[in-house]
Amino acid sequence: MANEIVSEFVNSNSKVDIMLFFILACFIFVMILRLLIYITVTYAGVSNSPILINGAVNGNNLRVFEQDPSVKGSIPIKRSTNKDGISFTWSTWLNIDGPGTTQGYFTSDQHIFHKGNNGIDPITGVNIPHNAPGLYLSPNNELVVYMNTFDSIDGNKVVIGNIPRGKWFNVIIRVSEQYTLDVYINGKLVKRHILSGIPKQNYGNVYVGLNGGFSGSISSLRYYPRAISNIDILNLIRDGPNLKRLTVDNSNIFSKGEQYLSLQWFLSSHSPDYL
């Protein structure tokens, strides 16, 4: 009788040990799986949708992001995934001090950023010939977007007027389904343009603040090799700009007071404009 009790106790302990071992093994497996997912998302995600300016800099600070992966410090921009035609997205935050003006050059537009060659036209202030895309600030307080296509170098131009000053606001340039170029301001679609042809992407560098740049600041410049979703856009607006200074300057726009532009500015006076 005593032997049977001892045998049952040993068997019972063995079952408990097996159960505990199984639970521990499952826990370790889940932790390893989560670690692998984190590593994959972190490193693959950064290379696919890099943040070129992870902070805030003055708009007149020239920055060049090399696309040659053999160059130390380069941030290569991957081409569109092409699942539904050429699709990609650029997002950035801007704080504009004033409209485009001449700064010792015969320029009319101020350069914010573009992807392509280094060939600013001294008369117009616009890069020639490659803008894929290009974002500029006009003397009329307008944002101007250029997008090269295979059939037209400068025929696809989008203008967004009445841009506010002294407030941080988000700009998204999204190309989807090959021919549709959308411009969002603070998550609201303010301009839709049907491209005249297939977008002409290039292997050129990304330039910020060429030819004296613009009067203001830029933050959180980011690229996606796809057309981001509305949820992605809302998340970008929710996260806001990264206001960490990347350079030393005397600007006070990095203060925490009134740094974001209210969506009411667009909802009350601007409806989407479809071209």
Predicted features along the sequence, with ranges:
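Extracellular glycan-associated modules
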Residues: M1-L275
